A protein has these predicted regions:
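Single conserved hydrophobic/aromatic residue that forms the stacking wall/gate
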Residues: 471-481
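Terminal amphipathic helices with adjacent charged low-complexity linkers/tails
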Residues: 291-299, 304, 436-440, 445-460
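Histidine-anchored nucleotide/phosphate-binding helix
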Residues: 89, 267-281
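Conserved phosphate/anionic-ligand binding catalytic regions in large, soluble enzymes, centered on
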Residues: 216-235, 327-339
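Local cysteine-cluster metal-coordination motifs and their immediate loop/turn environment
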Residues: 51-54, 81-91, 101-122, 138-157, ...
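Iron-sulfur (Fe-S) cluster-binding modules
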Residues: 1-65, 69-74, 79-84, 88, ...
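Hydrophobic alpha-helical positions that pack around
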Residues: 299-417, 429, 433
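Gly-rich Lys/Arg/Thr-decorated short loops/hinges at beta-loop-alpha junctions or inter-strand turns
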Residues: 189-196, 248-260, 355-358, 402-407
Length: 481
């Protein structure tokens, strides 16, 4: 057969195929750029696409067609699929090839509700007017530090109660790296009984079914919003066929919510132990931690602490994988998070089947948020009765509230389930600020609606807001002026 005939497409009659590939072509330099930047194994793993995009964004400050095309060739994924994935997430800046790349430093001004109340628009304008041309100023969604508004991120470092002078000083000193908090270290955690229960599990000194019963009796429910009973969820997942997986939803993206960040930056090993205990109970071979990219401090030190666990063989039963979110609000929804963990756009899945049946990579998956597993060790140490004995107005357990707005003492408040907003403000927050009147509050984030002050006696807990057609998210309570 002649060469010209060999290029004829089947079924295309006498039309000849093009003697070159259609579409954008990769260049050798861009291929080399990515090979030097991205671990080789990422190119063979579909679920590492978003992390690969992160590495390009981190290094070049944007995504340009030449690198997306090179990534397509290296991963053997269609360029359209890579572009659709990248364009879905707010933290990826897609530029045209001939566009000037963004400045080395980006200032992000939080425009969340509490930051709006504390003058973020004026702050953004003043910063835009005062910084040099090699710095860009953009608005960004809630950064999870609402009790210290307004918040500004310079590079990867967050400044709370920010003003122009603070930001200018950071620019002058190139103070743009995240601050690692003074959290409880592995050694200090172990000195206070940490990982004893997990070690007992690893050595088969614990009965997984008894641990499930203890969690069921405690009444602990999923604290990411859905409120599904934790012990029952463990039982359901354990009953499914192996292999099973676990996923942690650390994408604390509901505006006004910052409780997970609070716990992680103070006692990360309590979270990690609870996570590994839950994984052991359901016999999960792997656990995937999905952490929001807005928490660079947590991302940095949590990776370090996970390495310590690996050195101590505390993950001998369960491999730990760490993934970054990319600024998609919808990925707080569990099935959207699973799609994102698989390296795809975070589009919600139809249910059923539920993740406990068909979850990550099609396997039965136990999904918890950060705070839920944070309570596991304490409940197993002190007993189910200890946890369930707390509560007001007929409710059981403890709840963590992210309180911000016009209160004297905003912040994370641990209170009995069923407390009312009036009690929470008066007894835990020191009351309303001078010169302000309590007018309304958001009991469950931006998706949960606004309640007027006259409804200040409603118990704040699961199932208490449904008759008002409100959604309970995760206790991000704010006062509206």
């Amino acid at each position: 057969m002649k060469d010209s005939q060999s290029k004829i497409h089947p079924g295309s009659g006498r039309r000849k195929a093009l003697e070159f590939n259609k579409g954008r072509q990769s260049d050798d330099q861009s291929i080399d750029d990515l090979k030097n930047l991205i671990p080789n194994e990422y190119f063979r793993q579909r679920d590492m696409l978003i992390e690969s995009l992160h590495l390009i964004q981190d290094h070049y400050k944007c995504l340009k067609p030449k690198h997306l095309t090179a990534l397509s060739e290296l991963t053997n994924l269609p360029l359209t699929e890579i572009y659709e994935t990248a364009s879905f997430y707010a933290h990826f800046d897609i530029y045209k090839e001939d566009d000037i790349s963004p400045p080395e430093t980006t200032i992000r001004v939080c425009d969340g509700i509490t930051c709006e109340m504390n003058g973020c628009k004026t702050l953004e304008k003043n910063l835009s007017d005062s910084v040099s041309s090699n710095v860009r100023v953009v608005r960004a969604p809630c950064m999870g530090r609402c009790h210290q508004a307004p918040v500004v991120e310079v590079g990867k470092k967050h400044f709370v109660n920010a003003d122009v002078s603070v930001v200018q000083k950071a620019l002058e000193e190139q103070d743009t790296k995240p601050v690692i908090p003074n959290y409880i270290s592995y050694d200090d955690y172990v000195k206070n009984g940490g990982y004893k229960i997990l070690n007992d599990c690893i050595e088969n000194k614990k009965d997984p079914m008894k641990l499930i019963e203890e969690m069921e009796q405690s009444g602990l429910r999923g604290l990411g919003g859905a409120g599904f009973p934790t012990g029952r969820k463990w039982r359901f997942v354990r009953a499914e066929n192996k292999p099973r997986l676990m996923a942690i939803n650390g994408d604390e993206g509901e505006p006004g919510t910052f409780k997970d960040h609070h716990y992680l930056t103070r006692d990360p090993h309590r979270f990690l132990e609870g996570m590994l205990i839950a994984a052991w109970v359901v016999e999960a071979t792997d656990v995937y931690i999905y952490m929001r990219d807005e928490y660079p401090d947590v991302i940095k030190f949590l990776k370090k602490e996970i390495k310590i666990l690996e050195e101590k063989n505390l993950n001998i039963k369960t491999r730990i994988h760490f993934r970054r979110g990319a600024g998609a609000y919808i990925c707080g929804e569990e099935s959207s998070m699973l799609e994102s963990l698989e390296g795809k756009r975070g589009l919600p899945r139809h249910k059923p089947p539920f993740p406990s049946q068909v979850g990550l990579f099609g396997r039965p998956t136990l999904i918890h948020n950060v705070e839920t597993v944070f309570w596991v060790r304490e409940i197993l140490e002190k007993g189910a009765v200890w946890f369930s004995s707390h509560g007001l107005n007929g409710r059981k357990g403890l709840r963590t509230f992210s309180v911000s707005g016009r209160v004297k003492n905003p912040g994370v408040k641990l209170a009995p389930a069923g407390i009312t907003i009036k009690q929470l403000i008066d007894e835990y927050c020191g009351g309303i600020q001078e010169g302000h009147t309590f007018k309304a509050y958001l009991p469950g984030g931006a998706s949960g609606g606004i309640l007027p002050a006259k409804l200040d006696n409603i118990p704040l807990d699961f199932d208490t807001l449904q008759e008002l057609s409100l959604i309970h998210i995760s206790e991000p309570t704010r006062q509206v002026p």
